[in-house]
């Protein structure tokens, strides 16, 4: 069953808020901007992550140095799952952020 538009937006908003909290709680100098539903995270080394919502597809998209990734929400596991690798968003972010920022983050629950 497909997500309703309202549920989709609620889930993306909740996910972006969790991401902001995780990055805010770090000791790193990270700049974040959330504008029109797009969350941009800029690391000290100039690399960035961009999280955007694709409403028609009901997907959360992630742009990173290593590429672009599309996530569908899995109601059963209550997690965003990559539509290609089936990796959970949190697991993928732990790997990507370590590659880009050179530090480890805990994205448990995403």
Curated annotation (Swiss-Prot):
The keyword NADP belongs to this UniProt entry's keyword annotation: no
A Gene Ontology biological process term: iron-sulfur cluster assembly
Gene Ontology MF annotations: ferric iron binding; ferrous iron binding
Keywords tagged on the record: Iron, Metal-binding
Coiled-coil residue windows: none
Pfam family, one: Frataxin_Cyay
GO cellular component, one term: cytosol
Cross-referenced SUPFAM superfamilies: Frataxin/Nqo15-like (SSF55387)
Task performed by this protein: Involved in iron-sulfur (Fe-S) cluster assembly. May act as a regulator of Fe-S biogenesis.
UniProt cross-references to NCBIfam families, sorted A to Z: FeS_CyaY (TIGR03421)
Family, as annotated: Belongs to the frataxin family.
Protein name per Swiss-Prot or TrEMBL: Iron-sulfur cluster assembly protein CyaY
Organism: Pseudomonas fluorescens (strain Pf0-1)
